[in-house]
From Swiss-Prot:
NCBIfam families: PRK00026.1, trmD. It comes from the Bacteria. It comes from Paenarthrobacter aurescens (strain TC1). One of its GO terms (cellular component) is cytosol. Belongs to the RNA methyltransferase TrmD family. CDD domains: TrmD-like (cd18080). Its main location: cytoplasm. This is tRNA (guanine-N(1)-)-methyltransferase. Homodimer.
Length: 266
């Protein structure tokens, strides 16, 4: 996969040289290029922003530097239409499913906005050259797109074949199956009056798997009850359904629903 990031603060992306993403770059599993938007300006001050039409606070990023930068990036892959991801609180919400989807692409381009955002005409113009997807990390506002890009590139990059040493790690972690991950423990088994759950010391792998599954249900119901209704009840075993019933959930029309008047553990 090739990833291009355009930013006025290219040094902000330095963490992508570290850890698994950095190693993936060194091993040739991921080609990642960071471009300074200011190199695509034409004035001596390297200006990338101007006042907004219609008035209002703040500045808006000028369209021409962005067009020049994006044309340069798009030219790297002829006869293709890369995905252009624009981090924005007005975009679709980034989640694990979207990370998996984007990990299948050959090239991703990230446009890191600043100030009050990028001139909207850039987004309109880019539709002819890219598959444009404004994407949001969540319902909050950041100073710029770089932090969001760091998170998205790591979430996407670690899904590429060979990046994570043990592929099973990807299957068992939070959100891979719509649930939060079960709690994990290591040695010593007794620590400061807190013991590891006995089932994990039993050596009974079937019961351990069931315990972990039920802990996923419990943790998700407590911390992210919004995820529960998105589960496909068709894949639930009888033991799963009983565990969910104990947490206050019934299966209605193939989906989980909190029992009317019942108490879920959240």
């Amino acid at each position: 996969m090739r990833i291009d990031v355009v930013s006025i603060f290219p040094e902000y992306l330095a963490p992508l040289e570290l850890s698994l993403i950095g190693k993936a770059r060194q091993d040739g599993l991921l080609e990642l290029n960071v471009h300074d938007l200011r190199t695509f300006t034409t004035d001596k001050h390297r200006t990338v922003d101007d006042t907004p039409y219609g008035g209002g606070a703040g500045m808006v990023m000028k369209p021409e530097p962005w067009a020049q930068a994006l044309e340069s990036v798009a030219a790297a892959r002829e006869n293709s239409k890369p995905v252009l991801i624009v981090p924005s609180p007005a975009g679709e919400k980034f989640n694990q499913a979207l990370a998996y989807e984007l990990a299948e692409e050959e090239q991703l381009v990230f446009a890191c906005g600043r100030y009050e955002g990028i001139d909207e005409r850039v987004i309109d113009w880019a539709q002819d050259h890219f598959r444009v997807r404004p994407v949001s990390l969540g319902d909050y506002v950041l100073n710029g797109g770089e932090v969001a890009v760091l998170a998205m590139v790591e979430a996407i990059g670690r899904l590429l074949p060979g990046v994570v040493g043990n592929p099973e790690s990807l299957v068992e972690e939070s959100h891979s199956d719509g649930l939060l991950e079960y709690p994990v423990y290591t040695k010593p088994s007794a620590w400061r009056d807190h013991d590891v759950p006995p089932i994990l010391l039993s050596g009974n792998h079937g019961k351990i798997a069931q315990w972990r599954r039920h802990e996923q249900f419990r943790r998700t119901a407590e911390r992210r009850p919004d995820l529960m209704e998105g589960l496909d009840a068709g894949v639930l075993s009888r033991a799963d359904r009983q565990a969910l019933a104990d947490l206050g959930y019934d299966v209605v029309d193939g989906r989980l629903r909190a029992k009317p008047g019942g108490d879920t553990e959240n």
